[in-house]
Amino acid sequence: MQLFWHRRDLRTTDNRGLAAAAPGVTAVDGGHDQGPVAAVFCFDDEVLAHAAPPRVAFMLDALAALRERYRDLGSDLIVRHGDPAAVLPAVANDLDATRVVWNHDYSGLATDRDAGVRDALDAAGVAHAQFHDAVHHRPGEIRTNAGDPYSVYTYFWRKWQDREKNPPAPEPEPADLAADTALADTSPLPSVQELGFAEPEAAVPDAGTAAARSLLDAFRESGDIYRYEDRRDYPHEEPTSRLSPHLKFGTIGIRTVYEAARAAKSDADTDDERENVAAFIGQLAWREFYAQVLYFNQNVVSENFKAYEHPIEWRDDPAALQAWKDGETGYPIVDAGMRQLRAEAYMHNRVRMIVAAFLTKDLLVDWRAGYDWFREKLADHDTANDNGGWQWAASTGTDAQPYFRVFNPMTQGERYDPDADYITEFVPELRDVPADAIHSWHELSLSERRRHAPEYPDPIVDHSQRREDAIAMFERARGDE
């Protein structure tokens, strides 16, 4: 018998490690005869220490769906809680398993954990194998001609799109899996509270492969994929896939998403439609670019990627930070985004850029404070993606927004939410206010603002002044002053 250790790959289809372990599947590892596979998931306290209620709730829902799928296949999911370096050798011993298989993860925490598991399995005399599954191309596979990892996305993308991609891996057959009667006690799944977390305040999206597949199919069949590039920045329309939490937890495989996009591109009727699909595929490449940046620069989780001559003089402003978190800044598009985050454990991507730019360039607050808040509230928080996005907005990251380009939150709102539909969905105080007044809120007199929406706050900063302050702050950090 073998064990397959699930982590952020909570699915049975298009799972390269699971397919490689399955004796009857030859597409990934060429086939072997090392016995049927028993699936195991381990709640790791070190990983849970970095979790938050929305993601824990989503993960538990995904695990319930995964367990149900294994039961449909005549097997089950073994659930344990503890240090994987102790749990996996013990489960292997209980089941007389001779090999443990899992998929690579690329964060510093994951690579350290996996090294400890390998050492423990070696000491127990249990073989092990790992496979690349979460990305098409493992970190370091795509490099510059000089052999260095890319730090500029455009050049990475050019090579990424030309590389051959693996097809989706097949799901194991029931005969490939350990029968449920042969498994040790599988244990019930804990609740969010039993894992030490409060119930999430947000409405967490449905998890599981069926939910992910439904989203992907709807993205194609509705035609949204053919409008993706043209309309993705408009939060009220949002022709996006909403697959981000599913890719985070691996309830759908990256190859499945890529193949669906390729098929849509092949079926496109016009060059414009093909360009829209290509833009979506480009976002899949961004995900792998940031995974590579993190893999080779683990310090970016807490440090600027880009070195400045002097420290950036971020402001310690708890009141401004709290107003930003609460969606009470007096900048409507910013407040709508922050309130969507609380309500849905999600925020539209364009609005993520706007609120990140506002925190770092208008409030002059360190990007790490915003990153930490997103990590606490997002169901789709991914260390590499979120860190890359925050450092891009803060002009501290790889291939980042130039420091002198400062988003104007009012013009951003007017451009991407012209009728204020998104804003008024999440900021009810403004629902009876005309769109032109919402987009000129900062220019209205105090009496006009009180007449339109007495409960909505005044702008907490003057954008024009803070733009100058932000540029000066970065010029001092650069040593220009």
Swiss-Prot record:
Q: Which Gene3D superfamilies match?
A: 1.25.40.80, DNA Cyclobutane Dipyrimidine Photolyase, subunit A, domain 3, HUPs
- Print the keywords alphabetically: Chromophore, DNA damage, DNA repair, DNA-binding, FAD, Flavoprotein, Lyase, Nucleotide-binding
Q: Which residues form the Photolyase/cryptochrome alpha/beta domain?
A: 1-136
Q: Quick check: keyword Calcium in the entry?
A: no
Q: Check the record and name the PANTHER family matching this protein.
A: CRYPTOCHROME, CRYPTOCHROME CIRCADIAN CLOCK 5 ISOFORM X1
- Which GO BP terms, alphabetically? DNA repair
In the Enzyme Commission scheme, what number(s) does this protein have?
4.1.99.3
User: What segment(s) does the record annotate as region Interaction with DNA?
Assistant: 283-290, 349-350
- Any idea which positions bind DNA? R232, Q412
Please state which protein family the record places this protein in: Belongs to the DNA photolyase class-1 family.
Cofactor binding note: Binds 1 FAD per subunit.
Which branch of life, at top level? Archaea
Please identify the protein, giving its name as recorded.
Deoxyribodipyrimidine photo-lyase
Residues at the site labelled Electron transfer via tryptophanyl radical = W314, W367, W390
Subunit notes for this chain?
Answer: Monomer.
